[in-house]
Amino acid sequence: MASYKFKTQNSFLLLLSISFFFLLLLNKVNSTGSLSFSFPKFAPNQPYLIFQRDALVTSTGVLQLTNVVNGVPSRKSLGRALYAAPFQIWDSTTGNVASFVTSFSFIIQAPNPATTADGLAFFLAPVDTQPLDLGGMLGIFKNGYFNKSNQIVAVEFDTFSNRHWDPTGRHMGINVNSIVSVKTVPWNWANGEVANVFISYEASTKSLTASLVYPSLETSFIIHAIVDVKDVLPEWVRFGFSATTGIDTGYVQTNDVLSWSFESNLPGGNSVASVKNAGLSTYAA
């Protein structure tokens, strides 16, 4: 497993390659088993999302996952936002698996940069998924150990190092059925800066890749793992974001998502709960 920190030129090449794959998927979205949506910003009382616990959309169109009171983040906060329509990640009849690309931008800001906690994650889970434990479990796990019944795949952006399962320092991680990541890379979190994230899953190679770019700082981070989603996830899933703040006093941060898009293709799929047949429409500002 190689991890990299890129400067300007390599950041551009990384984004170019991810964008190319994104465009390949766009060319396929008219096939039967496809799902596509874009939120350039969010709307208050957003009908296309399921909000859990503290998550809400602000009057300025920001998806605020964890609680903020008078401009100050709250401790012991947990919030999740899921796309409203279930998503067929694989087809039990054909055995085919969906490829997908998702991109989103977020800001994590902390009153005290030395005491951040706990993090934000993009995840896929069973359709009936509910918020789980606070703090280091990021709202998506009940305990820190591998359990195949969890049926969860996540990419985490972890701002607090839990000594029982995390590497030292802030990091990105890929999680499969456990808060103990199968892969991690160091992440130089930038307080209050916009982070652009690109996550792709290529079904033919079972390759899950995530990159994070800070345009203002000209730095990027990338992580990759082989994940067989057909072995890990149920045929139908929900997906979205989860975030938590710390348990202890002072260990807090904002967890704000600014925009989000998603494209997928399931070859030969014939029953995908797409935006249209879920009774929803793609939202645009």
UniProtKB/Swiss-Prot annotation:
<keyword id="KW-0430">Lectin</keyword>
<comment type="subunit">
    <text>Homotetramer.</text>
</comment>
<dbReference type="InterPro" id="IPR001220">
    <property type="entry name" value="Legume_lectin_dom"/>
</dbReference>
<comment type="similarity">
    <text>Belongs to the leguminous lectin family.</text>
</comment>
<feature type="binding site">
    <location>
        <position position="156"/>
    </location>
    <ligand>
        <name>Mn(2+)</name>
    </ligand>
</feature>
<feature type="binding site">
    <location>
        <position position="171"/>
    </location>
    <ligand>
        <name>Mn(2+)</name>
    </ligand>
</feature>
<dbReference type="InterPro" id="IPR050258">
    <property type="entry name" value="Leguminous_Lectin"/>
</dbReference>
<protein>
    <recommendedName>
        <fullName>Seed agglutinin 2</fullName>
    </recommendedName>
</protein>
<keyword id="KW-0479">Metal-binding</keyword>
<feature type="binding site">
    <location>
        <position position="166"/>
    </location>
    <ligand>
        <name>Mn(2+)</name>
    </ligand>
</feature>
<dbReference type="InterPro" id="IPR013320">
    <property type="entry name" value="ConA-like_dom_sf"/>
</dbReference>
<dbReference type="GO" id="GO:0030246">
    <property type="term" value="F:carbohydrate binding"/>
</dbReference>
<feature type="glycosylation site" description="N-linked (GlcNAc...) asparagine">
    <location>
        <position position="147"/>
    </location>
</feature>
<dbReference type="GO" id="GO:0046872">
    <property type="term" value="F:metal ion binding"/>
</dbReference>
<keyword id="KW-0106">Calcium</keyword>
<feature type="binding site">
    <location>
        <position position="166"/>
    </location>
    <ligand>
        <name>Ca(2+)</name>
    </ligand>
</feature>
<keyword id="KW-0325">Glycoprotein</keyword>
<keyword id="KW-0464">Manganese</keyword>
<feature type="binding site">
    <location>
        <position position="158"/>
    </location>
    <ligand>
        <name>Ca(2+)</name>
    </ligand>
</feature>
<feature type="binding site">
    <location>
        <position position="158"/>
    </location>
    <ligand>
        <name>Mn(2+)</name>
    </ligand>
</feature>
<feature type="binding site">
    <location>
        <position position="162"/>
    </location>
    <ligand>
        <name>Ca(2+)</name>
    </ligand>
</feature>
<dbReference type="InterPro" id="IPR000985">
    <property type="entry name" value="Lectin_LegA_CS"/>
</dbReference>
<feature type="signal peptide">
    <location>
        <begin position="1"/>
        <end position="31"/>
    </location>
</feature>
<dbReference type="InterPro" id="IPR019825">
    <property type="entry name" value="Lectin_legB_Mn/Ca_BS"/>
</dbReference>
<keyword id="KW-0732">Signal</keyword>
<comment type="function">
    <text>Seed lectin.</text>
</comment>
<dbReference type="InterPro" id="IPR016363">
    <property type="entry name" value="L-lectin"/>
</dbReference>
<dbReference type="Pfam" id="PF00139">
    <property type="entry name" value="Lectin_legB"/>
</dbReference>
